[in-house]
Amino acid sequence: MKQFSQILFGLLMLTQSAQAQVAVQVNCSQWEEYPLVKKIGVYQTPLVNKKWLDRDFPKLEDLEARSMRYEMACGKDDLYGQPCVLGTAKRPTYSMTDVDYLLTLAKKYTPSLIIAHGYTPTILQSRPDEWAGFMDTPTDYDTWSAINKRFAREWRSKKYTNSYVEIWNEPDLKDGFFTGTLDDYLHIYETAAPAVIEGYSDIKVGGPSGAFNWWHQALCDRAKQKGLPLDFLSGHTYGPDYSGQLNAMRAALNSLGNNEAEMLLTEYSPYTPAEYQADGPVEKAEAAMTFFNALPGMLACPDLTHVSWAQYIDPGFFVGDKLGLIDRDSGAPKALYNAFRLYGMMPADRCQINIGGNVLQGMASVADDCVTAVVWNPSTTEQTFNMTLTNIPFKTGTLEVWHIDETENSWYETRKSTFTVSRSEPATINLKRQQLSDFVRSKGVCFVRIKSDEAKPLFPTTRLGTVVRTHQWFPNRTNEASYALFDPKTWTVRMSSNQEATGWALVGIEAERLPDYIQVNGKRNGSMRRSGSNYALCLRIDYQASTGEYVHSVLFHGGVYRDTRTTVLPWGTKRVPDEVVRVDNLNDFVIPVAEHQPADFNGRVILTCDMASIGSGVKQNFQFSEGTPTGISTPTPTAGEVQEEAFYDLTGRRMHHAEGLCIVRHTDGSTQKIYVPR
C-alpha cells in the first residue's frame, strides 16, 4: 500500500509538472512587427584609458551594434583625450590623436558614430582655474564656432561616414553639465551647428542631448526660425520609462516640419542611479532579463533610429558606478553584455511567437538558415516551458540553448567570463517542426537557436560602396506608421506598411564608389492591395554631377507602379524619374548603375527604396550586393515578339507618340529600353 501511494504521488507530481509547463508556439513563416534591427548601440564615456580600449573594444564585434556614442568632454582636462583644444582663444591649436584613436577603433566595429561636441574648452572658459569651468558658456563664440568646424573637418578626414554630432551633453542638467540658461544653449547651438555642416556637409547634427524633455520644442522653434540645420533630436533616460522623452521629441519634430529628422536616445539604462551602483542589479544576471524587457518598446518606434545603451565599459574614477556591459577592472563581459550578444545572434526578421499565461515574455526571428527564440522571466519563480517551432525553412541543423541566470553566463555571480552554451544537439526537425522543453530561472533568460547545417554568417559585412549618409522619412510619427530601415553593415533594407493601407515607406542610401552592377535580392511577406494612383513598390537611383547637384534618375519596378505617378522624392533630383524601367522580378535583378549614369557623374548616388499605398501588413526586404552584367536581359526585338510598348519623355512622363524613352515589354517577360529620337 505504501509503495502504491508513492507511485501515485509521483504520478501526481509529474502531472502537475506537465500542467505547469508554459506552451510557447513559434511560427517561422509569419513575419511580425517590429523587426529586430540592431539599432541598440552603446555609449562610451571618456572615463577610460587606452589599455581598456585595446582590451574591450574588439568585444564590440560580437554585439552587432550599429552605433557607438562618445562624449568628448572638452574642458575636463583630466579625462581621456583631453585637452584636445590648446593654444589661446584667438589662436587655438589641436591635439586629436587620442580622440581619433578611440573613434577609429569604434568605427571598425560600429558603422555609425555619435559624437557629442562639448563642453567649453579650457581656452574659452571664464573660470579656467576651476574644475567646474567646463560648464560655463564660451567666452568667445567665434572661436567656439571655429572649434566645431575644425572637429567636423577632422571627422571628415578620418572618414567617419554615416555619423552624427550632438551639440553639448545634458545642458538642461543645471550645474551638472551647464551653468547657462536655455537661451544660452540655443546660442551655443546656433553658432556650432552651421559650423559643423560647413566642416563636414554629410554628417548629421542635432541636440539637445537632454537629461530631461524640456528643451526639444525650443530647439526646434529656434532651428525653424533661423533656418539652422537640425537633423535629429536627442535625449536621455535612466529608468524603465523612456516614453516621456520620445513623446516630447515627436511633438517637437512634428512642429519642425522636417520629415527626415530622427530621434536618438543617446543615453539609456533601465536602472536609476541608486540601482547601478556596485553590487546592484545592473551587475547581476537579472540585467539580461531587464535588457530584453526593454527591447520591444524601443523596436516599436521606427522613428527612434539609434539607442545608446549606458554604458559600454564601466566608467573609471567613480568607484561605485558600475552600469557598464564590461567590468572595468577585469575586462570580463557581464550578464548584460551576454544579453546584447544573444540579441546580436537573432535574425532581424521577426516572426510570430505566442506564449501561454501572463508571466513569460519572448521574441522570435527567422532567416533562411537560422531560427531563434528568446524567452525571459520577470517573475521570482522558475518557469518551465514546452516550445513548438513550425514552418522551419530548412531540414537539418543543430539545436542550441543558452541560459543567463545566477548560475550561468553571469560573471557577477559565477566569476566565469566564458560564454557557455547549455545544450547543443542535432535538431529533430520533422515536417518543418521542432519541439523542445526547457526552463527559465527567476529573472533569467533562455535563448533557443536552430541553425542549419549550411548556415552562413548572419550579418556579413557587405562591401558594396561607402555609405555617406542615410535619408530617413517619417511623415507619420506614430508606432503604427509605415517605415523603411537600412542596415549599413549588410546593405539590407526592411520596409513595412505596418498598419497603414496608404502609407509611404521610404529610405535613401547616399553612397559613393558603387560597382557598375548591383545585384538586388528581395523577399516579401503579406498580400498587397493597391490603393489610389500613387501606389508603388520600386527602387530608384539618383546620380550626382560634379556640381554637387543631383541631375538624373532612373526608377526600376516589377509592375507595382503607375506610369502616371506624380510623387517626387524629398531628396535627389526632387522630381519624377527621368527613366522608368520595368524588370521581370524586382526580387531578383541587376541594376546596371554605369549604364544610366550621366556624362558629368561624380561617383555619388542616392539609392532609394520606395513602397507606397499597397495595403497594410505588407513587408518587403531588399538586400544589395555586387552584381554582374549576366543578370541583365535585353534581347533585340524581332517581329511578333513585342507585347507592349510605352513611351516616356525624359522627365518620366508617359507619351502617346514614338519620341523619348521607349520601354518595350516582350512576350517572354523581359524588357528593353530604347531611346527614340524625333
Model-derived regions: residue spans:
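Aromatic/acidic polysaccharide-binding cleft in carbohydrate-active enzymes
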Residues: 270-372, 378
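Extracellular ligand-binding interfaces
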Residues: 495-603, 608-626
